[in-house]
Amino acid sequence: WDDMEKIWHHTFYNELRVAPEELPVLLTEAPLNPKANREKMTQIMFETFNMPAMYVAIQAVLSLYASGRTTGIVMDSGDGVSHGVPVYEGYALPHAIVRLDLAGRELTNYLMKILTERGYSFTTTAEREIVRDIKEKLCYEALDFEQEMSTAAASTSLEKSYELPDGQVITIGNERFRCPEALFQPSFLGMEACGIHETTYNSIMKCDVDIRKDLYANTVMSGGTTMYPGIADRMQKEITALAPSTIKIKIIAPPERKYSVWIGGSILASLSTFQQMW
């Protein structure tokens, strides 16, 4: 918590350059964040920073607001964890939230591993940052993994080059889509978990049968780990295969989804009806 306090202090005084005691603050929390954490956040805001008012919102709900919806299911995937979060009329449904311990960090580690198999060595934390950059710039989600693998084997059309900080140029081929494939096939990482498509589906299935149709038709992707090109089409394909054939499925993947939690927070805090909620 001391570290968290330092980050907030830095944000208020060095980055925003505001007096926290003059402005209300909207904080966001992960789904299923324990009550004790929320109480501690509140205590620090009021006692350390003398905030006049505050509100704590669930991240996935804000992402949904950012897409202009109040009902839907959010597949939120960041660096450390992914969640399927169903939201009905602005409220997250805690009993149906499904957590998946697979996100950006695991994908970066996996890319480090498969690049090592190609003969490139990345081990230090600095090199790990380079691999993260390669991941963010060159990786994409294959619509059909097996087909993409045979395309990659037959030609060099999928190969891209990347210049390392020291000027060395490396070539990356099927790793470009093998890395994010782990989101749909966690077995690549030696994990027994379900992929993000099944996690989303399982979350929908934990909801009341009457609202499932609305969730399928409003499936919103959010967070940095959903930024791979092709991920929405792949998600559409995978969920269509799991869902009843008569159901309309719509995957919403806004271009600004890396920051949709922040955007949703900004929308919420500016609503006139919200002002009495602080």
From Swiss-Prot:
tRNA processing found in the keyword field: no
GO molecular function: ATP binding; hydrolase activity
Primary enzyme class: hydrolase
EC number: 3.6.4.-
Main localization of the protein described in the UniProt heading: cytoplasm
Gene3D superfamilies: 3.30.420.40, Actin, Chain A, domain 4
Pfam families linked to this entry: Actin
Highest taxon of the lineage: Eukaryota
Catalysed reactions, as listed in the record: ATP + H2O = ADP + phosphate + H(+)
UniProt-listed PROSITE patterns: ACTINS_ACT_LIKE (PS01132)
Compartment(s): Cytoplasm, Cytoskeleton
GO CC terms in record: cytoplasm; cytoskeleton
Keywords: ATP-binding, Cytoplasm, Cytoskeleton, Hydrolase, Nucleotide-binding
Family: Belongs to the actin family.
Function: Actins are highly conserved proteins that are involved in various types of cell motility and are ubiquitously expressed in all eukaryotic cells.
Protein name: Actin
